[in-house]
Amino acid sequence: MSLTVEVDVMGTIVTLSLFHADGVDADRAKPYFDEAEHVLREVDRVFSTYRPESPVSRLRRGEMALGEAPPEVAEVLDLCREAREMTAGWFDPWAMPGGVDPTGLVKGWAAGRALSVLAAAGTDGALVNAAGDLASGGVVAPGQAFRAGIADPASPGTLAAIVELDGALATSGTYERGSHLLNPHTRVRESAVASASVTGPDPALADAFATALCVGGEAVFERLIDLDGYEALLIGFDGSQRLSPGFALVEASV
């Protein structure tokens, strides 16, 4: 049995879920849901580029030094540097117009922080779904792992694949918005594939890798398959799929 709370934050709906074989007590779960929501709202307050007075917006405009910003900003930018190096620059927040923009990693990072709060509730499992960025811990029920669907970018409302989830899943793609990702090497908004999904232990890095794969395609895929714990699924504009050897695909073309 499960209990789910929806939070309208970061320009999307984030779902917070707890799972337990004997059921989830709503009163006992409430403090964990409340704290997880607080974490998400604080991330939005600090990192939103749509809030003119957020620390990240002020940092981008040169009105605030990094040392004056909340410490989590430096933490996230360190992760961004790590992801930039691991993707050979295909993920590069410093290439964004208007100054450094860690948006391509923050949602996954926020999901991971919220999951850490929910995991302390002591249930069989916990799940955070931040509109394409999933962070999971534990199981749905004893012996039953989490599963997640990957949307078909060419057919809204249908699934291209189902994956067994142990940790994080991040998906980036064209979907309804078309090509919205900036190629950091050409500074042009373009995508190499229709969709890129990444599983792995760190929701923030999975988020960054999915973004990099979407714009870099095969060039990033070849680097990613050498990273311990991370797997990928690419869906081409023609519907073709390419999986890394360890991608936990349950079902394709659903």
Language model features by range: what are they?
Residues M1-V254:
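Mature catalytic core of soluble alpha/beta enzymes
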